[in-house]
């Protein structure tokens, strides 16, 4: 690295192209070595990072009967599993399997197998989120009717069986995003956001607490967030303090909140949740990260020290936490900053016009 180059300077990799329509979601696996993308062309693509930093597409197939809104990775502890949700009102669980080719038994190739279709939603599924691994293989989803549904795989080695274990009515308007808290020290929380423009400011974020003694999720009424704009995304920090969570919310700008955890919500050393009453939480907004009121998606890094947002104007902004509740802008990059070479443009156009996609909608492998 040259002396005049900032250690935090962002340099884009080569353009990757696979979809014929608008890309709705880009998701990295927990190790950052694999990437999944989905788009309005009803397809999903899997990418593997190469040693030189470029991305090689390893799979691309038609996965739904409508536009695909989200694709997410489960923790690698459960295998190479991704989930996708779509405008066709379904959630599909996919699992990668390594098989031997028929021509050469020594040669191996990967195949993505459709394990199951969850089709009990009565409306479009807008977001999905896997639970942290210490809670097992569970999945939360939300839909346009304001409902949150939680599914669980009773056997973590069998991704083909999922049971609906909870259904929560978060809003009477559209749900747009859902996320889990990641702390092992506290009772699990689920935060839900509404991107409905007609919703009131105090009716855009709802947080539920899991009380193990009652085996149910209960709404925390003491947490009422008055947000100025529809909620397009929200995420808990992967690192929690002993007595607090940190929650980032994209509502025009990026709002960062500290949620104070009462002693009754802190789990015992053996992980047992003894009290059965609802804990009394409190919160404080500790930072407002300006994004020209266009924040769309937000993510934390692995240690919770950097927040990155993507905006409606095609700009990616990152902020770094320097001290307690102090954030400074780390970088800003626009899609127009990268100009693909003629060779890259030719490869993308060629792939879009000549490629035939394998469809897995008519076949299920077990």
From Swiss-Prot:
WD repeats lie at residues 18-57, 63-104, 111-152, 161-209, 226-267, 290-329. It holds the Pfam family WD40. Probable component of the nuclear pore complex (NPC) which is involved in the trafficking of macromolecules between the cytoplasm and nucleus. As a component of the GATOR complex may function in the amino acid-sensing branch of the TORC1 signaling pathway. Belongs to the WD repeat SEC13 family. One of its GO terms (biological process) is cellular response to amino acid starvation. The keyword Repeat applies. SMART domains: WD40. InterPro entries: Sec13/Seh1_fam (IPR037363), WD40/YVTN_repeat-like_dom_sf (IPR015943), WD40_repeat_dom_sf (IPR036322), WD40_rpt (IPR001680). Keywords: Lysosome, Membrane, mRNA transport, Nuclear pore complex, Nucleus, Protein transport, Repeat, Translocation, Transport, WD repeat. GO terms for cellular component: lysosomal membrane; nuclear pore outer ring; Seh1-associated complex. This is Nucleoporin SEH1. Component of the nuclear pore complex (NPC). Probably part of the GATOR complex. GO terms for molecular function: structural molecule activity. It is found in: Nucleus, Nuclear pore complex; Lysosome membrane. Its main location: nucleus. It comes from the Eukaryota.
């Amino acid at each position: 690295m040259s002396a005049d180059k900032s250690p935090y300077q962002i340099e884009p990799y080569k353009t990757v192209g696979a979809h014929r329509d608008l890309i709705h979601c880009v998701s990295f696996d927990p190790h950052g070595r694999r990437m999944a993308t989905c788009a309005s062309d009803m397809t999903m693509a899997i990418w593997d990072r190469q040693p030189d930093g470029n991305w090689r597409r390893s799979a691309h197939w038609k996965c739904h009967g409508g536009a695909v809104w989200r694709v997410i990775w489960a923790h690698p502890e459960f295998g190479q599993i991704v989930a996708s949700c779509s405008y066709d009102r379904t959630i599909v669980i996919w699992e990668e399997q390594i098989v031997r080719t028929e021509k050469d038994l020594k040669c191996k190739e990967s195949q993505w197998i459709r394990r199951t279709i969850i089709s009990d939603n009565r409306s479009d599924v807008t977001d999905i989120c896997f639970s942290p691994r210490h809670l097992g293989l569970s999945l939360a989803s939300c839909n346009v009717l304001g409902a949150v549904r939680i599914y669980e795989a009773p056997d973590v080695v069998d991704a083909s069986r999922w049971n609906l274990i909870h259904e929560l009515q978060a809003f009477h308007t559209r749900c747009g995003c859902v996320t889990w808290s990641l702390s092992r020290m506290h009772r699990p929380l689920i935060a839900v956001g509404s991107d409905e423009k007609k919703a009131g400011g105090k009716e855009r974020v709802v947080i539920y607490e899991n009380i193990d003694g009652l085996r149910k999720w209960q709404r925390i009424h003491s947490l009422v967030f008055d947000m100025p704009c529809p909620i397009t995304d929200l995420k808990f920090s992967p690192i929690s303090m002993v007595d607090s969570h940190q929650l980032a919310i994209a509502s025009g700008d990026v709002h960062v909140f500290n949620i104070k955890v009462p002693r009754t919500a802190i789990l015992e050393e053996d992980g047992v949740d003894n009290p059965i009453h609802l804990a009394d939480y409190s919160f404080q907004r500790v930072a407002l990260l300006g994004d020209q009121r266009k924040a769309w998606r937000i993510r934390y890094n692995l240690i919770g020290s950097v927040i990155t947002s993507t905006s409606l104007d095609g700009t990616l902004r990152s902020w770094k936490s320097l001290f307690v509740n102090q954030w400074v802008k780390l970088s800003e990059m626009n899609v127009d900053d990268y100009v693909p070479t003629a060779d890259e443009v030719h490869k993308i156009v060629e792939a879009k016009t000549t490629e035939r996609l394998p469809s897995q909608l008519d076949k299920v492998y077990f």
